[in-house]
Amino acid sequence: MGFVYYVTLFVFIDDWVGLQSSAGKLNALLFSLLASLCLFSLSICVLVDPGRVPASYAPDVEDSGWSNSNVTETRKCDKCFAYKPLRTHHCRVCRRCVLKMDHHCLWINNCVGYANYKAFFILVFYATVASIYSTVLLVCCAFKNGDSYAGNVPLKTFIVSCGIFMIGLSITLGTLLCWHIYLITHNMTTIEHYDSKRASWLARKSGQSYRHQFDVGFYKNLTSVLGPNMIKWLCPTFTRNPEDGISFSASRDS
């Protein structure tokens, strides 16, 4: 991230319009804002606990199936030897159960789960926007200074290498962003997506249609992660919602 920030400001913007110009200052300010939002989102992903099962948690036996508004399931972790709520999984790296676990992310050295999934998604969003923005600035810089770069082999090699890197980074982050948009709009975690493949195959085999049990509709799926206030959707701080990480609204209740 530090390398991308440095070359964007002191190479791409400076060589294109100059950092002291009005356009240069504006672009530097906008990119610095994006970089700050990335760092803020990253810090939340790293520092916030993804979701710990309460020590006092015990499933309600009478509510072990479908209820009026929520679904729960009695399950016990064979590693923690404790009850774990629905959508909770045991992380082999963290060596504990995580509420609504999506995956363990090596880049943040933390699990992505109920309490920090929004921050992770917003981090990917801002990082994608920043990488595309940097790539556009690189292209503008290259078009303006193409002739001068052509006569300087080391500089030309550096610019081309940066272009390959930034395009690859933008495609990678953009793909990751699209993937998590898909998961959010279907109210799935990464783990549940792969689990649902078999369920979907079995449903088709028996001539039935399959719908993920927590898919409660496009808008409700979005608000379950991003929160009910649209103004705060791009703020990475965790937004409390009616779900508590232990019980969740189910599709047959929607």
Swiss-Prot record:
Belongs to the DHHC palmitoyltransferase family. The DHHC domain is required for palmitoyltransferase activity. The keyword Amino-acid biosynthesis does not apply. This is Probable protein S-acyltransferase 15. One of its GO terms (molecular function) is protein-cysteine S-palmitoyltransferase activity. The chain crosses the membrane at residues 1-21, 28-48, 119-139, 164-184. Residues 75-125 form the DHHC domain. It is a multi-pass membrane protein. Palmitoyl acyltransferase. It comes from Arabidopsis thaliana (Mouse-ear cress). Its main location: endoplasmic reticulum. The gene is PAT15. Its EC number is 2.3.1.225.
